[in-house]
Amino acid sequence: MTTERTALFAGSFDPFTVGHESIVARGLEIFDRIVIGVGVNAQKRAWMTPEERVSAIRELYAGEPRVSVMQFGCLTAQAAAECGARFLLRGVR
């Protein structure tokens, strides 16, 4: 069993904003690793495709090895299990 503290930060991120960046930065002070999960909801009208969002976020964090990005279309709990996250990172809105 790993002791690494991994958090999933899930959202549509359409677009990924400076507010989202701030949450990730603060999350990195708490967690060893953060997985940014780009959720896909076919019923939502999106400005960018999921692939474009994933690509843009990966580019933004290319120099930060503790941040990774995934796309998911399942329940957040299932996505957390898939990426090994035991914590969810959320902001207040």
Residue locations for each model-derived region?
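Nucleotidyltransferase catalytic core that binds NTPs
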Residues: 1-93
